[in-house]
Amino acid sequence: MKRKLSILVLAAVGAAMLAGCGAGTANGSTAADNAANESTTDVATDKADASATDSSENVTAEVPEDNGTVSTDGSTSMEKVIGALGESFMAQNDGVTFTYNPTGSGSGITAVAEGRCDIGLSSRNLKDDEVAQGLKQTVLAYDGIAIIVNPENEVSDLDVETIAKIYTGEITNWKDVGGKDAEIVLIGREAGSGTRDGFESITGTEDKCLYRQELTSTGDVITTVAQNPDAIGYASLASVKDTVKAVSVGGVVPTEETVKDASYVIQRPFVLVTKEGTELTPTAQKFFDYVTSADAAEIIAKAGAVAAN
């Protein structure tokens, strides 16, 4: 462009000189002015080129900075699985730092939407309004939701209908389901929990549960049930310890195999949440690709869940 503009200016100077031979000082001034205009045009073009270069540099600067850290935020039920994957990833990549903030599914989804973490963690599928915000889900694994009681409790099997009646207050005493004469103490998770969302949607008890306590983490639910012989709760199968007893549901024991073949019906997905149009850093993208590959399946299985891939 610069060269083209210069050629046009020189042609104009030549035409003026031919038309004004012997015309005196006035035409000489015109030629000088045209020469000056050529210089001015060149300067302006240089500035335009520089501006274009600056603009290009600004676009490049918008690519996310990679500081070697992968930050995740969300589901407490995913702690065992995501922790194992994070440790494995760091072991294979020197200098990389992996962080996990166990805030709950709802908070993790919000953190991604607001750009406060690389990857959100949810133990439920995204809702329509969350997808409308430009959020995207990728299923990492599947996890059973275990129905847990105190080890001293004689009850060992409940069907989905009975579980629903217990949590909605239709059944209030353990003797009505084969246990001792004692009031059933209902333990659950807080609103916004992916585990609660999964449990209530499967049992058909949304907004109907009469919780005695609504706790903020999987670990708190397990600890509370372990300490109260009359309590019942629900928790990620991957996190269940021998301090509580997981009852069978409709005669099916919750295991990796029964979750995988779907015979254990109280189960939900473990989801990675990202934002459409927001590029992950190279390190975060490498982590995402790793955990969703077949290479991670064994680690996920050892953590008690069933890999989606």
Question: What do the predicted segments below correspond to?
Answer:
Residues 1-7, 11:
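Positively charged n-region of N-terminal signal peptides that target proteins for export
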Residues 4, 22-309:
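Exported/periplasmic ABC-transporter solute-binding proteins
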Residues 9, 21-22:
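N-terminal leader and targeting sequences that precede the mature domain
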Residues 16-20:
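C-terminal motif of bacterial Sec signal peptides marking the signal peptidase cleavage site
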